[in-house]
A protein has these predicted regions:
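Catalytic domains of carbohydrate-active enzymes, especially glycoside hydrolases
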Residues: 42-58
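Active-site-adjacent loop and "lid" segments of alpha/beta metabolic enzymes
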Residues: 5-6, 12, 29-38, 42-43, ...
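Extended, charged alpha/beta regions that create polyanion-binding interfaces
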Residues: 1-2
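Short acidic capping loops at alpha-helix termini that bridge into adjacent secondary structure
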Residues: 91, 178-181
């Protein structure tokens, strides 16, 4: 399995670590720490040196209760950072955005993946993504970032997320985005309580029936904090456990804050999976 963008390819026969680069003042874990262009590029460099093969640049906090950001502000935050990384490093760049303007401009300056928590549901986003020809990550979220954690409710979380993916894949294909350009993210922590999150993690491998890359993001999230009763800065061990559980089930991309530790954990996973006669990766 491979992804293609900007004249390059990403081989998904082994798990990739995606380093989180939030250029926001209010992200739940690292808001305000990489706001200047120099700081953002420095942090990207550190993550790449630690083994990240994808950098995920986000200019709008999507934590529960987060305020919305204007198009102009998000463009000012994101585009210079994407351009600077693209010019300096041989790394894939993902842009965490829902806005069509940011999708288009990111593609022009070198982004490889559109990572949209709203699955191209904003007006014009679907058309913008189709125009760029870039791979798109579709994520499941119940509600919206402001309200999603108020009282999430499912009869069957896996079945509902699975049905959502079926609908969104069809919607993308109708808009001219080929299925092989899509990635899937169950959306851990987005409109889900503790039970929903762990039931999805336990059944993650079942999403392979789509034959699409799976991206997961559980790093430092409340599904770990609530379980262990610790704050965001003390969630490394829980984050690594989630990353390993996902990768052992064949997750292709693990989105994290702590790159070095996750890369080391993935080496252990790869050694274990390659020792099996029947590998889970193709």
């Amino acid at each position: 399995m491979k992804l293609f963008a900007q004249g390059t390819s990403l081989d998904l026969s082994h798990p990739h670590v995606m380093g989180i680069l939030n250029v926001t003042p209010d992200s739940f874990s690292d808001g305000g720490t990489h706001n200047s262009l120099i700081d953002a590029v420095k942090h990207a460099n550190l993550m790449i040196n630690a083994g990240a093969t994808i950098i995920d640049v986000g200019g709008e906090s999507t934590r529960p209760g987060a305020a919305e950001v204007s198009v102009e502000e998000e463009l000012q935050r994101v585009i210079p950072v994407v351009e600077a990384i693209a010019q300096r490093f041989e790394v894939w760049i993902s842009v965490d955005t829902s806005k069509p303007e940011v999708i288009r401009e990111s593609a022009k300056v070198g982004a490889h993946i559109i990572n949209d928590i709203r699955s191209l549901s904003e007006p014009g986003a679907l058309e913008a993504a189709a125009e760029t020809g870039l791979p798109v990550c579709l994520m499941h979220m119940q509600g919206n970032p402001k309200t999603m954690q108020e009282a999430p409710k499912y009869d069957d979380a896996f079945a509902e997320v699975n049905r959502y993916f079926i609908e969104q894949i069809a919607r993308c294909e109708q808009a001219g985005i080929a299925k092989e350009k899509l990635l899937l993210d169950p959306g851990f922590g987005f409109g889900k309580n503790l039970s929903h999150n762990y039931s999805l993690l336990a059944r993650l491998a079942e999403f392979h029936h789509f034959n699409l890359p799976l991206l997961v993001g559980m790093s430092r999230k409340s599904m770990i904090g609530q379980l262990l009763n610790v704050g965001p800065s003390e969630r490394l061990s829980g984050s690594l456990a989630c990353a390993v559980i996902a990768a052992m089930q064949g997750a292709h991309i693990i989105r994290v804050h702590d790159v070095k530790e996750t890369v080391e954990a993935m080496r252990v996973v790869e050694a274990t999976l390659s020792a099996k006669e029947n590998k889970r990766y193709e």
